[in-house]
Amino acid sequence: MNHELRSVIDAINPVDQSLMAAAQAHLDNLTKPRGSLGRLEELAARLYCIAGGRRPLRVDPARVFTVAGDHGVSAEGVSPFPQEVTRQMVLNFANGGAGINVLCRTAGVDLRVVDAGCLGGPFPEHPALIQRKVAEGTASIARGPAMSLETCEKALLLGISLAEEAAADGCRCVGTGDMGISNTTPSTALYCAYLGLDPADITGPGAGLASEAVRHKVEVIRRALEVNRHIVEAGDPVATLAALGGIEIATLAGLVIGAARHGLACVIDGFISTAAFTAAWKICPDVRGYCFLSHASAEPGYRSVVDALNAQPLLHLGLRLGEGTGGALAMFLMRAAADIFNDMATFADAGVSEADD
């Protein structure tokens, strides 16, 4: 592993779960029946642990990174959309016209759009676009590794640097977002490699494939797993990410690692972002305590993924857009959980009698 990457991972402190009891004691002393705010209490307690027991809890400023990259596997016919849509959507993000732009504005969340691996050379200069291209797309995973180990490590380090910059700007929470035509295919391949799942069980329509095309997509993923089997079986999670992933997926995995390094809460978006989280978790298990799955993707295989991760998404809205949209929405809940912890009165403060034991 790259020395710089190893030094970041070694510097990550696991979340102190021993603080959970103090967090719950505070929540139980607020003017409400115990547990009556449900998962908001769980969120608040986890945020307290991430903060190391420091109060008040803070989620803001919050920032979503929508990271874009192209995929060689697009040539295998696994998406109904042409590859140039990746580039077109990056320009749409930069101009403020996409779903993620609207939802970030609604949620009061900062948005940064990142070209990590788009085809077509540099974009025109734009104040809303971060241009740090690691490479121009990937090779087809159905024919060999998506990228070299060096390229993958550069993408991971790019993501780490994005988290470092967010922390330097005072952010307390970051969110993951993606854009890359065909990127449900490498994401599915990563789930199969990391979690031992079968492509036939978790492969879905992505951006709208018909049933026959989904069956073709399953076969493409099977070929990818077979041609890269020697890499996957060697057990190196970074090499597996290089073999089966994408540049934006690796960058988002680095963002997760960087968030943990700087003690930031990290809100994970949908199907592709959860693949990036899974890669980061395999590379450094301690990142898990900093991460929150924002929503249950409508991709058919996502339930199997969540079960394999033993995780519970926050929202169930049938979303399948990506871009970071679910993460932006979930930041409302993160903010609400922090405010409850910070601002609700205790029984003693309010002069309210507690329930009898």
Swiss-Prot record:
Pathway: Nucleoside biosynthesis; alpha-ribazole biosynthesis; alpha-ribazole from 5,6-dimethylbenzimidazole: step 1/2. One of its GO terms (molecular function) is nicotinate-nucleotide-dimethylbenzimidazole phosphoribosyltransferase activity. GO terms for biological process: cobalamin biosynthetic process. It catalyses: 5,6-dimethylbenzimidazole + nicotinate beta-D-ribonucleotide = alpha-ribazole 5'-phosphate + nicotinate + H(+). Disulfide bonds: none annotated. Its EC number is 2.4.2.21. It comes from the Bacteria. Belongs to the CobT family. Catalyzes the synthesis of alpha-ribazole-5'-phosphate from nicotinate mononucleotide (NAMN) and 5,6-dimethylbenzimidazole (DMB). This is Nicotinate-nucleotide--dimethylbenzimidazole phosphoribosyltransferase.
